[in-house]
């Protein structure tokens, strides 16, 4: 190996972007780490012993994300405190050829930030500084561990906000939002994370640091920011993120409409969008979800007897215009079957209505000890039929499905509550989940809107993409990470679908041939087989 001397690598120096070689940062000597102890010692030299976790109870803390289905115990957990430490860690692991997984707050819902025992988990929550708020240019520069809602709170004195608002915004980080291209209720009008990221500083798999995009937001050349956002940690580690801030709306109107059937509520969604007025948000909850919320500490005053409610919000810069739009939407809702429409009288009522929606996932924890959280997107016009089909699937499998989702853009979240200790129940849940995903795809939809592929959706990828398409995705990944060491085993299934199907079915406990997914997974994809060297 070039630079190797007596079991050590030559010293590695690096300079941050914009820093001349004469001002290089302190040098790290990187031992070959022939065993865990030497790796841990070197990591401790970089971040300090307190920030390297090797004890099993500590590592178990990071074995899951917000989705309890998957469990992976990392070999080592390291918590850098600044971007220089991140770069040093990534360079160390690159020199050693070791896999690693970047992780934020662990609120993800796809198993995307889990690391196997042979991988190092790099937890970025200590990189939590808001480096700059530029009110004049309406942008902010943040580290990846900044909690989403903190940025809006910091921007509020300037009359600005960061508009992507996932339900977990009080806990999730901007870096995690970038990895998943997170959305939220208000992405209907304002767009998902990709709409708001202007520039990124990224540590690649080998520790090289690159800048993507520009604070001015004017694109030139390939859209590498757009490629990185939503890459689920496969391309590198974002160490600094420049985002767009928008003015806080001067006028807001929030409406709650209730319906006696899911179909009617679904039809009303299309009618609202067809009116020509795009709400800031348009959310739906079904009766199961409504009752879970109303039985919890997050009770929002939703009508318990409603089959579904729509939560619609209009906002803008002029009170009269927003009021007129709200009146139009109220009329549309009533004309399309709303039993009643309530308008929040003040900010307190509005906050209460939104608290129930934002905390709905937590409230569903009351229903049973286990919860499968699904994420799919369908065309709005198909919502009535898809919702009815999901209800039929749940009934056939004897399961409870609670729907809470971003209705305005057709981003479904059918959630299945169950007790995994009941013999055979987990298998029924997974079979029902597969049928729900197949239903969404058949309706012209896709398998994720904002939660990502991660581990959870790997087995569905061949339903959407043939072998050539999957091989192309893998080729793009290899441009960023030739050895596929960054967050390995996520997003793109790298083995032949025939072989990979058996592994995944064994893990999920799904019997071959029990769902539409199994048949699809047995379809050979020659391009991917050749790519993986499978014979």
Which positions does each model-derived feature cover?
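Intrinsic disorder/low-complexity segments
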Residues: 1-31, 499-535
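A glycine- and small-aliphatic-rich helix-loop capping segment at beta-alpha/alpha-beta transitions
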Residues: 110-128, 156-160, 183-194, 242-247, ...
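FAD-binding subdomain of flavoenzyme oxidoreductases
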Residues: 129-283
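N-terminal flexible segment immediately upstream of the FAD-binding catalytic core
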Residues: 28-91, 108-138, 167, 287-299, ...
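C-terminal substrate-recognition/cap domain of FAD-linked oxidoreductases
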Residues: 53-63, 243-247, 253, 258-432, ...
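Activity-critical C-terminal alpha-helical subdomain
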Residues: 208, 458-500
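Alpha-helix capping/hinge segments and adjacent helical runs
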Residues: 49, 441-453, 477-478, 482-486
